Amino acid sequence: MAPPAPPPACPLCAAPGAHVLHQSARRRWWLCGGPCGLVYVDPAQRPDAAAERAQYDLHRNDPADAGYVRFLGRLVEPLLAALGPAPRQGLDFGCGPGPTLSGLLAAAGHAVADYDPIYRPDVALLARRYDFVTATEVVEHFHEPAREFARLRGLLRPGGLLALMTKRRAQPERFAGWHYKNDPTHVSFYHTDPLGWIAAGWGATLTLPAPDVALLRLPDSPPAD
Protein backbone atom coordinates (compact mmCIF):
# COMPACT_ATOMS: atom_id res chain seq x y z
CA MET A 1 0.00 0.00 0.00
CA ALA A 2 1.34 3.42 -0.94
CA PRO A 3 2.00 5.78 1.96
CA PRO A 4 -0.50 8.63 2.36
CA ALA A 5 0.34 11.83 0.54
CA PRO A 6 1.87 14.52 2.74
CA PRO A 7 -0.32 17.48 3.65
CA PRO A 8 -0.19 20.28 1.08
CA ALA A 9 2.18 23.11 1.99
CA CYS A 10 0.56 26.33 3.12
CA PRO A 11 -0.16 28.52 0.06
CA LEU A 12 0.61 31.67 2.07
CA CYS A 13 3.78 30.95 4.07
CA ALA A 14 4.80 27.64 2.38
CA ALA A 15 5.14 25.86 5.71
CA PRO A 16 4.73 22.07 5.77
CA GLY A 17 3.00 20.12 8.49
CA ALA A 18 -0.61 21.26 8.08
CA HIS A 19 -3.33 19.26 9.76
CA VAL A 20 -6.98 18.76 8.87
CA LEU A 21 -9.18 21.29 10.63
CA HIS A 22 -12.46 20.02 9.16
CA GLN A 23 -13.64 17.61 6.51
CA SER A 24 -16.95 17.17 4.72
CA ALA A 25 -18.08 14.76 2.04
CA ARG A 26 -16.68 17.07 -0.66
CA ARG A 27 -13.98 19.20 0.92
CA ARG A 28 -11.08 19.17 3.31
CA TRP A 29 -9.88 22.29 5.10
CA TRP A 30 -6.27 22.42 6.27
CA LEU A 31 -4.84 24.54 9.09
CA CYS A 32 -1.33 25.80 8.40
CA GLY A 33 1.30 24.11 10.55
CA GLY A 34 3.62 27.09 10.33
CA PRO A 35 3.70 30.69 11.48
CA CYS A 36 0.83 32.24 9.51
CA GLY A 37 -2.18 30.19 10.65
CA LEU A 38 -4.04 30.27 7.34
CA VAL A 39 -6.90 27.83 6.78
CA TYR A 40 -7.17 26.64 3.19
CA VAL A 41 -9.14 24.21 1.07
CA ASP A 42 -7.25 21.20 -0.25
CA PRO A 43 -5.75 22.30 -3.59
CA ALA A 44 -7.28 19.28 -5.35
CA GLN A 45 -10.76 20.46 -4.29
CA ARG A 46 -10.63 24.06 -5.46
CA PRO A 47 -13.11 25.06 -8.18
CA ASP A 48 -11.84 25.57 -11.70
CA ALA A 49 -12.15 28.88 -13.54
CA ALA A 50 -15.44 27.98 -15.22
CA ALA A 51 -17.07 26.96 -11.93
CA GLU A 52 -15.85 30.15 -10.29
CA ARG A 53 -17.24 32.30 -13.08
CA ALA A 54 -20.61 30.54 -12.88
CA GLN A 55 -20.79 31.28 -9.15
CA TYR A 56 -19.73 34.92 -9.55
CA ASP A 57 -22.34 35.46 -12.26
CA LEU A 58 -25.01 34.77 -9.63
CA HIS A 59 -23.97 37.85 -7.65
CA ARG A 60 -26.19 40.88 -8.04
CA ASN A 61 -24.09 43.52 -6.30
CA ASP A 62 -24.33 46.96 -7.89
CA PRO A 63 -24.62 50.64 -6.94
CA ALA A 64 -28.43 50.50 -7.00
CA ASP A 65 -28.49 47.91 -4.21
CA ALA A 66 -28.87 49.89 -0.99
CA GLY A 67 -28.02 46.88 1.15
CA TYR A 68 -24.78 46.34 -0.72
CA VAL A 69 -23.86 50.00 -0.37
CA ARG A 70 -24.45 49.79 3.40
CA PHE A 71 -22.32 46.65 3.51
CA LEU A 72 -19.43 48.43 1.80
CA GLY A 73 -19.82 51.31 4.21
CA ARG A 74 -18.16 49.19 6.88
CA LEU A 75 -14.96 49.56 4.87
CA VAL A 76 -15.53 53.01 3.39
CA GLU A 77 -15.78 54.87 6.70
CA PRO A 78 -12.47 53.69 8.25
CA LEU A 79 -10.72 53.84 4.88
CA LEU A 80 -11.66 57.49 4.31
CA ALA A 81 -10.49 58.35 7.82
CA ALA A 82 -7.16 56.63 7.18
CA LEU A 83 -6.62 58.22 3.76
CA GLY A 84 -6.81 61.80 4.91
CA PRO A 85 -7.45 64.70 2.54
CA ALA A 86 -8.57 63.94 -1.01
CA PRO A 87 -7.69 63.38 -3.73
CA ARG A 88 -5.82 60.09 -3.51
CA GLN A 89 -5.35 57.58 -6.31
CA GLY A 90 -6.68 54.08 -5.71
CA LEU A 91 -7.49 50.76 -7.32
CA ASP A 92 -10.46 48.55 -6.51
CA PHE A 93 -8.95 45.09 -7.07
CA GLY A 94 -11.66 42.53 -7.78
CA CYS A 95 -14.44 45.03 -8.36
CA GLY A 96 -16.83 42.42 -9.76
CA PRO A 97 -19.43 42.88 -12.50
CA GLY A 98 -21.04 45.95 -10.92
CA PRO A 99 -18.33 48.30 -9.59
CA THR A 100 -19.69 50.16 -6.59
CA LEU A 101 -16.90 50.94 -4.15
CA SER A 102 -15.08 53.18 -6.62
CA GLY A 103 -18.16 55.38 -6.93
CA LEU A 104 -18.51 55.72 -3.16
CA LEU A 105 -14.88 56.76 -2.87
CA ALA A 106 -15.14 59.08 -5.87
CA ALA A 107 -17.98 60.87 -4.09
CA ALA A 108 -15.44 61.66 -1.36
CA GLY A 109 -13.04 63.14 -3.91
CA HIS A 110 -10.75 60.18 -4.64
CA ALA A 111 -9.86 58.78 -8.07
CA VAL A 112 -10.36 55.01 -8.16
CA ALA A 113 -9.81 52.63 -11.08
CA ASP A 114 -11.71 49.34 -11.32
CA TYR A 115 -9.94 46.04 -11.98
CA ASP A 116 -11.33 42.53 -12.02
CA PRO A 117 -9.60 39.49 -13.57
CA ILE A 118 -12.91 38.30 -15.04
CA TYR A 119 -15.14 41.31 -15.58
CA ARG A 120 -12.66 44.19 -16.05
CA PRO A 121 -9.32 42.60 -16.93
CA ASP A 122 -7.40 45.76 -17.82
CA VAL A 123 -3.91 44.52 -16.99
CA ALA A 124 -2.43 47.95 -17.71
CA LEU A 125 -3.85 49.00 -14.34
CA LEU A 126 -1.59 46.44 -12.66
CA ALA A 127 1.51 48.17 -14.01
CA ARG A 128 0.80 51.32 -11.97
CA ARG A 129 1.18 52.16 -8.30
CA TYR A 130 -1.46 53.64 -6.06
CA ASP A 131 -1.96 55.45 -2.77
CA PHE A 132 -4.45 52.76 -1.78
CA VAL A 133 -5.84 49.46 -3.01
CA THR A 134 -9.15 47.95 -1.92
CA ALA A 135 -10.09 44.28 -2.06
CA THR A 136 -13.60 43.62 -0.77
CA GLU A 137 -14.69 39.98 -0.54
CA VAL A 138 -11.68 39.04 -2.68
CA VAL A 139 -8.85 37.47 -0.69
CA GLU A 140 -10.92 34.45 0.38
CA HIS A 141 -10.96 33.48 -3.32
CA PHE A 142 -7.16 33.41 -3.64
CA HIS A 143 -5.87 29.99 -4.72
CA GLU A 144 -2.30 31.23 -4.34
CA PRO A 145 -2.42 33.88 -1.62
CA ALA A 146 1.37 34.32 -1.42
CA ARG A 147 1.50 35.32 -5.07
CA GLU A 148 -1.63 37.47 -4.92
CA PHE A 149 -0.60 39.37 -1.79
CA ALA A 150 2.79 40.02 -3.39
CA ARG A 151 0.88 41.47 -6.35
CA LEU A 152 -1.18 43.70 -4.06
CA ARG A 153 1.97 44.84 -2.25
CA GLY A 154 3.54 45.77 -5.56
CA LEU A 155 0.60 48.00 -6.47
CA LEU A 156 1.17 50.30 -3.50
CA ARG A 157 3.35 53.36 -3.24
CA PRO A 158 5.46 53.90 -0.10
CA GLY A 159 3.05 54.75 2.70
CA GLY A 160 0.23 53.16 0.70
CA LEU A 161 -2.79 51.50 2.24
CA LEU A 162 -4.33 48.10 1.51
CA ALA A 163 -7.96 47.87 2.63
CA LEU A 164 -9.39 44.36 2.90
CA MET A 165 -12.87 43.11 3.59
CA THR A 166 -13.23 39.41 4.38
CA LYS A 167 -14.86 37.58 7.24
CA ARG A 168 -12.32 36.54 9.83
CA ARG A 169 -12.13 32.82 10.27
CA ALA A 170 -14.16 31.19 13.01
CA GLN A 171 -12.36 29.57 15.92
CA PRO A 172 -11.47 25.91 15.28
CA GLU A 173 -14.19 24.61 17.57
CA ARG A 174 -16.81 26.59 15.60
CA PHE A 175 -15.43 26.12 12.11
CA ALA A 176 -17.69 23.18 11.21
CA GLY A 177 -20.79 25.36 11.56
CA TRP A 178 -19.33 28.49 10.00
CA HIS A 179 -21.38 29.44 6.92
CA TYR A 180 -18.63 31.41 5.17
CA LYS A 181 -16.65 28.26 4.38
CA ASN A 182 -19.56 26.79 2.40
CA ASP A 183 -19.26 29.05 -0.64
CA PRO A 184 -17.47 26.82 -3.18
CA THR A 185 -15.29 29.73 -4.32
CA HIS A 186 -14.03 30.51 -0.81
CA VAL A 187 -10.73 28.68 -0.44
CA SER A 188 -8.52 30.79 1.87
CA PHE A 189 -9.56 31.94 5.33
CA TYR A 190 -7.87 34.54 7.51
CA HIS A 191 -7.96 35.78 11.05
CA THR A 192 -5.61 38.03 13.00
CA ASP A 193 -2.60 35.70 12.76
CA PRO A 194 -2.41 35.47 8.94
CA LEU A 195 -3.12 39.18 8.60
CA GLY A 196 -0.45 39.99 11.18
CA TRP A 197 2.00 37.65 9.44
CA ILE A 198 1.44 39.47 6.13
CA ALA A 199 1.80 42.89 7.76
CA ALA A 200 5.02 41.89 9.52
CA GLY A 201 6.52 40.64 6.28
CA TRP A 202 5.76 43.97 4.64
CA GLY A 203 6.90 46.08 7.57
CA ALA A 204 3.34 47.40 7.58
CA THR A 205 1.06 48.45 10.39
CA LEU A 206 -2.19 46.50 10.77
CA THR A 207 -5.42 47.91 12.12
CA LEU A 208 -8.73 46.06 12.42
CA PRO A 209 -11.47 48.70 12.51
CA ALA A 210 -14.35 46.22 12.07
CA PRO A 211 -14.79 42.44 12.43
CA ASP A 212 -14.44 41.94 8.67
CA VAL A 213 -12.18 44.89 7.77
CA ALA A 214 -8.39 45.13 7.87
CA LEU A 215 -6.13 48.02 6.91
CA LEU A 216 -2.44 47.46 6.19
CA ARG A 217 -0.31 50.58 5.79
CA LEU A 218 3.16 50.39 4.28
CA PRO A 219 6.02 52.39 5.75
CA ASP A 220 6.72 55.73 4.08
CA SER A 221 10.02 54.44 2.73
CA PRO A 222 11.23 50.91 1.93
CA PRO A 223 13.19 49.20 4.73
CA ALA A 224 16.96 49.36 4.36
CA ASP A 225 18.71 46.20 3.15
What is the role of each PLM region?
Residues 1-132, 136, 147-150, 165, ...:
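Conserved N-terminal segment of class I S-adenosyl-L-methionine
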Residues 84, 143, 157:
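Short conserved AdoMet
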Residues 111, 161, 205:
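Residue-level detector of anion-binding/catalytic polar loops
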Residues 137, 141:
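A short His-aromatic
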Residues 165-188, 193-194:
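Short, glycine-/aromatic-enriched active-site segment of Class I SAM-dependent methyltransferases
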Residues 192-204:
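Low-complexity, intrinsically disordered Gly/Pro/Thr-rich segments
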